Regions:
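N-terminal Sec-pathway targeting helices
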Residues: 1-15
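Extracytoplasmic/lumenal domain signature
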Residues: 32-61, 69, 76-119, 123-217, ...
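Hydrophobic single-pass membrane-insertion segments
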Residues: 21-32
Length: 492
């Protein structure tokens, strides 16, 4: 992320000017025609890291909840209903007095940050008969609260800087939260004591070299006792957690960093103006491949099977998008990738590729593009939020205030909601065929989806006094979302 909310260093001025809004349909640039069959990626039959059956499903069976950013390792689970059909109301605001604010520095310049920002989705989960909410805020703290009351159930953990990312709650039932901070550290945090406690941390500078920054915005994936995540240090990391319980019944971890691979190569550095190769999106895993992209727009897939024999992951897919890519990759049942890109540099590659794409990663190069859209009317523009996938549509929101419903087969934009050029950074949620959008003027809007038809608005609610950059968590029809006004809200 190259605006103030993200990297501590700014990228250079754009290389190429010119802005426009254009739909480029498949069939152009020698791409497969979306109306004709496109061979899906072949499925692997051996034991896999994350089955294709997990698409749209919760993150395993051990813990009920929305446990990570966009719900599961393919980033395709958005919570549970029943979604409210009547306008809900704010039941609590956290904190009830004051605000979650602190000073964070960009170089030697300090600014006050309040509330929760991009991506900022709380994790919500059931444990011991109650619903809990885990999140990090711009008060530099990790919180665990009772979702019904908005009250802390554990003493918050103070880190050294603001927290921008979304936590992951252990999907196997260990009392652990995984979350990074702008203080350079990714933490494994226990919650089986009176207070939240750091059991282990990985510093961005524990690997070399560091390109381009040292924050941790990605929400880690936990699978097979491994932690997998990208960092703004430019690396993809694999940590063996070695989770267990001690004689006192408390959770124990003995993590070991077993692999870190750079998310850049010399070919990328040769064509991008600065080594801005931070990984800010949350990695997505489909079968045995992990997908992510970086601030220089390098989309990549790494095979995880070598880990079984003690070897590092192997890169098997490379595609240059041309510009900063902070939205997480979304994967469908057949292994197609849905990719959303920002338009900040404005180079020839980003003008050619577009900002919303469906890609077949089994086909190398531009021939793997199934369809694409250019969504830029200014600079910067494009997409910061992670799109929501349904059985028929991809729903993407843009920096210029548009919510687009794109047919995943044809690539046609079937509908468009226009919010008048205000940034839509909060990722859209789809629950019970209802769409929830959060805007930068503090609005929560709910729509009834109806296939290719224009969605019908069913309610709208003004919440707080600031911008919604953070993404909502929806669980059992209750909505939890942080605002830049300094508050987290419980709404139902």
């Amino acid at each position: 992320m190259l605006k103030s909310i993200g990297l501590k260093f700014a990228l250079p001025a754009a290389l190429v000017g010119g802005c426009f809004f254009l739909i480029v349909k498949a069939g152009s640039f020698s791409k497969p025609d979306p109306e004709s069959p496109v061979e899906p990626p072949s499925k692997q039959t051996a034991s896999v890291w994350n089955s294709s059956d997990s698409i749209f499903q919760p993150y395993g069976d051990a813990v009920k909840g929305l446990l990570t950013f966009r719900g599961n390792p393919t980033r395709t689970f958005y919570g549970t209903g029943p979604f409210p059909l009547q306008t809900p109301r704010v039941r609590w605001a956290y904190p009830d007095r004051g605000s979650m604010c602190s000073v964070s520095y960009l170089g030697d310049k300090g600014d006050t940050w309040c509330g929760m920002g991009w991506t900022g989705q709380p994790a919500v989960f059931e444990r011991e008969g109650r619903t809990l909410l885990a999140f990090g805020g711009f008060d530099k703290k990790v919180h665990l609260m009772d979702a019904s009351t908005g009250r802390d159930v554990k003493t918050p953990l103070l880190t050294g800087d603001i927290i921008k990312g979304s936590p992951t709650v252990d999907p196997d039932g260990y009392p652990l939260i995984y979350l990074g901070s702008r203080d350079n550290n990714l933490r494994v945090i226990s919650f089986d004591g009176e207070a939240l406690k750091t059991l282990w941390s990985l510093n961005a500078y524990d690997v070399k070299p560091v390109l381009w920054d040292d924050d941790w915005d990605s929400a880690p994936v936990i699978l097979k006792d491994y932690l997998l995540t990208g960092g703004e240090n430019g690396h993809f990391h694999v940590v063996k957690l070695n989770r267990s319980y001690g004689k006192d019944g408390k959770v124990v971890v003995r993590p070991k960093l077993i692999a870190n691979v750079p998310g850049w190569d010399q070919e990328l550095l040769a064509v991008f103006p600065k080594p801005a190769v931070s990984i800010e999106n949350s990695v997505a895993i489909y079968e045995n491949t992990v997908y992510f992209a970086n601030s220089a727009g390098l989309l990549q897939g790494w095979d995880l099977t070598p880990l079984a024999t003690g070897k590092p992951p192997k890169r098997i897919y490379r595609f240059w998008l041309g510009d900063d890519t902070d939205a997480s990759i979304v994967v469908d049942r057949d292994g197609f990738l849905y990719v959303a890109v920002e338009y900040e540099i404005g180079n020839q590659r980003s003008q050619f590729v577009g900002q919303i794409l469906k890609i077949n990663p089994r086909i190398a190069g531009d021939s793997g593009i199934v369809w694409r859209h250019h969504v830029r009317t200014k600079k910067p523009d494009g997409v910061w939020s992670t799109p929501a996938l349904t059985e028929t549509h991809l729903i993407a929101t843009t920096d210029s205030g548009k919510a687009l419903g794109i047919n995943i087969k044809s690539g046609k934009i079937d509908w468009n909601l226009n919010y008048g050029n205000q940034p839509l950074w909060s990722s859209p949620n789809v629950i019970d065929n209802k769409l929830l959008l959060a805007t930068c003027d503090g609005l929560l809007d709910a729509y009834q989806l109806n296939g290719s038809q224009q969605p019908r608005k069913i309610w709208g609610l003004k919440v707080g006094r600031g911008c919604f950059e953070a993404t909502a968590a929806v669980w059992n029809g209750r909505i939890y979302i942080g605002n830049r006004d300094g508050k987290l809200y419980g709404i139902w």
